């Protein structure tokens, strides 16, 4: 508290030689060789899945117990039972417990608020202090959007992109990231220069409640979620049956019968409205956008509309037009797009009064990519590294 790889199944800083990021990547390599053990939890509304990580690898067979979300005593009892079962099979004593849990919550204090999917959590449940009293080790709780972003920033997309840029001969290195999960809801987390943005009210990165571009009276999550894909497909196709996003994706692919145009539109509309929200968010963050979650498996239909929205234009009353973003957004999954992203617009400019020149890249740019390690892995690694970082700093 101190506060799915199968996509459809889980359906600019100029750093000189990039030395700062090389050091950060070496720092992560230290974690992969770290012998400290952290117990983790995947907290779903139906089941709890317990495990443990050492050196960046899962070292325990997962233990699965029902969440018992409607009975607080049973829920807390299963949390204790699950962690004790994991602890009993470990080669040494774990140094911490770290996991994601739904909000609202005061994550720093380890107190969980009134949860829609956990009816028994009402009036504030001191989950962190409870577990710390039982196990005698620090407990760190965050939301899944934050831990997804943290995992991608330290162990996933960000170090991978910076490595690829160096290999391409680019001097550009990135240190800021907006992590986005597309699934039951529209989650997000922000990492600025290796630091997770928690916010003064544990609400940092909450993008789900942004205004909806198409339906301004509603939140954007109404158009960026599993329920949105299902709703739009039904509206466009006239099909009164209930179709899951996986089925709608297969209709779009031509694998299953159905209205293919409506299926494609269901995902592209999500991309457009997610792109509108992300354009506002990334204007403040100015970094890499990485997308995960179950719906990211349909990225081929989501990302074109999302990129189009990011690179759209706006204007002034005098008729002037300019980009919605100061930066151009590139799709990093595409080889040609990545090559342009890496190349930028680097030139050399003279230093007045001397014979020397310095490098200058006037091309402001960001990248959009899909998580390669998957949301579950990124969240677990985010929880693991979050705990080790805080323990090392004595927080």
Language-model region placement:
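ATP-binding/phosphotransfer module of carbohydrate and carboxylate kinases, centering on a glycine-rich
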Residues: 19-95, 106-109, 133-137, 160, ...
């Amino acid at each position: 508290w101190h506060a799915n790889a199968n996509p459809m199944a889980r359906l600019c800083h100029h750093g000189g030689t990039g030395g700062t990021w090389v050091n950060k990547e070496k720092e992560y390599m230290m974690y992969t060789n770290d012998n400290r053990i952290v117990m983790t939890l995947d907290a779903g509304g139906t089941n709890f899945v317990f495990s443990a990580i050492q050196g960046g690898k899962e070292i325990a067979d997962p233990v699965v117990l029902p969440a018992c979300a409607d009975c607080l005593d049973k829920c807390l009892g299963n949390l204790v039972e699950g962690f004790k079962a994991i602890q009993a099979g470990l080669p040494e004593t774990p140094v911490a417990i770290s996991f994601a849990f739904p909000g609202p919550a005061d994550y720093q204090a380890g107190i969980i608020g009134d949860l829609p999917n956990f009816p028994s959590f009402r009036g504030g449940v001191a989950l962190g202090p409870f577990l710390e009293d039982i196990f005698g080790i620090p407990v760190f709780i965050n939301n899944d959007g934050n831990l997804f972003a943290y995992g991608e920033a330290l162990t996933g997309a960000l170090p991978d992109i910076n490595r690829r840029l160096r290999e391409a001969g680019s001097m550009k290195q990135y240190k800021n990231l907006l992590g986005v999960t597309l699934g039951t809801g529209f989650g997000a987390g922000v990492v600025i220069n290796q630091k997770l943005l928690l916010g003064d009210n544990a609400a940092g990165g909450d993008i789900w409640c942004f205004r909806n571009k198409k339906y301004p009276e509603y939140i954007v999550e109404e158009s960026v979620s599993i329920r949105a894909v299902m709703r739009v497909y039904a509206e466009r196709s006239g099909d009164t049956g209930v179709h899951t996003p996986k089925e709608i994706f297969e209709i779009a692919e031509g694998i299953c019968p159905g209205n293919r145009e409506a299926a494609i539109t269901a995902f592209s509309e999500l991309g457009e409205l997610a792109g509108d929200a992300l354009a506002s968010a990334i204007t403040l963050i100015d970094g890499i956008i990485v997308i995960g979650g179950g719906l990211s498996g349909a990225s081929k239909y989501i990302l074109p509309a999302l990129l189009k929205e990011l690179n759209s234009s706006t204007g002034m009353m005098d008729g002037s037009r300019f980009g919605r973003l100061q930066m151009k957004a590139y799709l990093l999954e595409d080889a040609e797009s990545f090559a342009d992203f890496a190349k930028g617009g680097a030139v050399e400019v003279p230093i007045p009064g001397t014979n020397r020149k310095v490098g200058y890249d006037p091309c402001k740019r960001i990248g959009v990519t899909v998580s390669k390690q998957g949301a579950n892995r990124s969240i677990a690694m985010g929880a693991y590294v979050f705990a080790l970082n805080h323990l090392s700093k004595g927080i």
